[in-house]
Each structure stands twice: as structure tokens, then as C-alpha cells.
Amino acid sequence: MNNRVHQGHLARKRFGQNFLNDQFVIDSIVSAINPQKGQAMVEIGPGLAALTEPVGERLDQLTVIELDRDLAARLQTHPFLGPKLTIYQQDAMTMNFGELAEKMGQPLRVFGNLPYNISTPLMFHLFSYTDAIADMHFMLQKEVVNRLVAGPNSKAYGRLSVMAQYYCQVIPVLEVPPSAFTPPPKVDSAVVRLVPHRTMPYPVKEVRVLSRITTEAFNQRRKTIRNSLGNLFSVEVLTELGVDPAVRAENISVEQYCKMANWLSNNLPSKES
């Protein structure tokens, strides 16, 4: 028997499809999301409706974004969900979540079992819409969740950690074994809750500057900051900002990166930032 077939659908590798089929895990995720009628619930990658059905049961209306044409068609003709669903058959990476929130008249509650092959770029896409999002609950590769929640001085801490924690409060919810899926992925999974900050703990003037600094620092994570960011900050400036020039990218806190970004915004001509 082909273990990539679930409910008559062949999982497509190019879409990173692994279908959730463990009822205990499904119930735990739905409890964590706690969907309520009247909320603007949006699911990314509903697949074979493992989460869509129990969430949809609690709602009058649910919006879903599904790239796979066959799966979108199945949802359209679903016996009890069909009439409740608004289906966008497109790549979530091309979705304007700000426009969607405007259309729905309130901030979005986004959830999904994200395809692991696009989870990191999709997170960055969603971060640019945090003003339009109330919260997010995602099933991700456990290693990605570890990176999202990691603090300084750990191997898992990187650019994703800094940017996620700049935008959101990040809360791990539960771990999920490969056996909960068809076909089983080769990695462990985990569910994470991301709640966008309503008041930024460390406001920055230009997010693109923070993004630039973290990209340059973590692309050369074995180098000290005086070397990896020497083209942007002198040793004196780093010291003035409370950053030891001899440490590496992984030793610098989110707050310190934000201070560095604000200094750079104030001291670089706009065309350079």
C-alpha cells in the first residue's frame, strides 16, 4: 500500500504535504486555538480538513487558503463544511493578509499545518502583516519552533528568533511525533502560538534596517560582531550601545539588535539603509 495516499489523495512532495491523522493531537490543537463564532478565522493549507472540520464545526464561516487545486475542489463540495467556507485557491505567500483583514472587518486568527518546505519564508511574509493579525497557531517542524522560541547564547538562536520575537510573543504549545501524519515526515513536529505585540517592547524606526543587521550578523555567525558588522558599526559605537564587540551574533539579545537598528537608522543616509 502506498503510504503517501490518505483519504484517496496522493500526498504531493512538491507541496510538502503530510496529512495530520491523530485524533488526540487534532483535539489538542483545536483546544489551543479555541475558535469562537464571529472571529475572522483563516486556515493556511487545510489539506484533507483534519483541522478544518473540527474548527469549522464551531464556526459559521471559515476562510481557507489552499494551493492544491484538487484539495480546494474537495473542500468546495464538502458535505457540511462547503457552505461555510470561503476558499482562496492560491499560494499563501502571495496573499495580502492586510486586505483580507479589512474585508473581514477585524484582525485575523490564522492557523494551519504549514508545509515544511515553505514554513520559514511564510513566517516572514506573515510578520509583515502583524498589524492585521490577532494571533497565529501553526504546526511546524520542531526544529523551526525551537528556533522561533530560542534565546541568546544558544545554537538555535538566529535571525528567525530575533525577527519573530521582535514582532510576536512566541509560545510553544505541544510536540507532535511523525506517527501523527500520513505519510510520516522524517522529523518531529511541534505547535506554536504567535501573538503579535500590540505595543512593541523594543520599537524600531525601520524594520528593514533590523532585518539587514540580523541577516549580515547571522550569515557570518562564527565571526565576532566587530568583524561581521564592522562595515556598519565601529567598536566605539557598539560599546556605547552596550554590545561587546568580541561576542558573536548568537550572543546579542533582541533588545540590543533593536538598539543597533535605531542607531543605524539615525546615522546612515537613507539610501544606504
UniProtKB/Swiss-Prot annotation:
Its EC number is 2.1.1.182. Keywords: Cytoplasm, Methyltransferase, RNA-binding, rRNA processing, S-adenosyl-L-methionine, Transferase. One of its GO terms (cellular component) is cytosol. Pfam families: RrnaAD. S-adenosyl-L-methionine binds at N18, L20, G45, E66, D91, N113. SUPFAM superfamilies: S-adenosyl-L-methionine-dependent methyltransferases. One of its GO terms (molecular function) is 16S rRNA (adenine(1518)-N(6)/adenine(1519)-N(6))-dimethyltransferase activity. Belongs to the class I-like SAM-binding methyltransferase superfamily. rRNA adenine N(6)-methyltransferase family. RsmA subfamily. InterPro entries: KsgA/Erm (IPR001737), rRNA_Ade_diMease-like_C (IPR023165), rRNA_Ade_Mease_Trfase_CS (IPR020596), rRNA_Ade_methylase_Trfase_N (IPR020598), rRNA_adenine_dimethylase (IPR011530), SAM-dependent_MTases_sf (IPR029063). This is Ribosomal RNA small subunit methyltransferase A. Specifically dimethylates two adjacent adenosines (A1518 and A1519) in the loop of a conserved hairpin near the 3'-end of 16S rRNA in the 30S particle. May play a critical role in biogenesis of 30S subunits.
